[in-house]
Amino acid sequence: MFPMVTEFMNYGQQTIRAARYIGQGFMITLSHANRLPVTIQYPYEKLITSERFRGRIHFEFDKCIACEVCVRVCPIDLPVVDWKLETDIRKKRLLNYSIDFGICIFCGNCVEYCPTNCLSMTEEYELSTYDRHELNYNQIALGRLPMSIIDDYTIRTIFNLPEIKT
């Protein structure tokens, strides 16, 4: 008779413990109910990127001195710099500059070490294409400034998201 009573008491304690765990989980769920959503509706809402965001690289052809520092500091030797030595003035003349963003890891070393600051990171991150060869940007494509999403009236911009506290 006593083993049956102790089993019944253990069953009751386990039931109370299970109900307490379910209640704790439900309280955590309810604490998240009044927070703002973390996800955004992407094509119609876009985040304003931070100041130090590393997006597409912008290139200013007139400032470049063809020193190839960007190629030397790149971990994958990505920028292609074609130049010609002008013998009469003994300086390099830049002919072509290109970066393949299909291979680029957006580390920012080329921007950081450029002595003339002809490279800069933009806030543009929408580089998707159907053909990977379209990601090879020459100096003309690199020279284009990105469109500002703040000026686009069809897109709702979101300035800050709720931070996740860990």
From Swiss-Prot:
Q: Could you mention a single GO BP entry for this protein?
A: photosynthesis, light reaction
Could you say which cofactors this protein requires? Answer: [4Fe-4S] cluster
GO molecular-function terms, A-Z: 4 iron, 4 sulfur cluster binding; iron ion binding; NADH dehydrogenase (ubiquinone) activity; quinone binding
Q: Name one Pfam family in it.
A: Fer4
Instruction: Give the InterPro entries listed for this entry.
Output: 4Fe4S_Fe-S-bd, 4Fe4S_Fe_S_CS, NADH_quinone_OxRdtase_chainI, NDHI
The protein's superkingdom reads: Eukaryota
Keywords noted in UniProt: 4Fe-4S, Chloroplast, Iron, Iron-sulfur, Membrane, Metal-binding, NAD, NADP, Plastid, Plastoquinone, Quinone, Repeat, Thylakoid, Translocase
Which intervals hold domain 4Fe-4S ferredoxin-type?
A: 55-84, 95-124
Q: How does it sit in the membrane?
A: Peripheral membrane protein
Q: What class of enzyme is it?
A: translocase
According to its UniProt record, where is this protein located?
Plastid, Chloroplast thylakoid membrane
- PANTHER family referenced in this protein's UniProt entry, alphabetically: NAD(P)H-QUINONE OXIDOREDUCTASE SUBUNIT I, CHLOROPLASTIC
In the record, the note on similarity to other proteins reads:
Belongs to the complex I 23 kDa subunit family.
Q: Which protein, by its recorded name, is this?
A: NAD(P)H-quinone oxidoreductase subunit I, chloroplastic
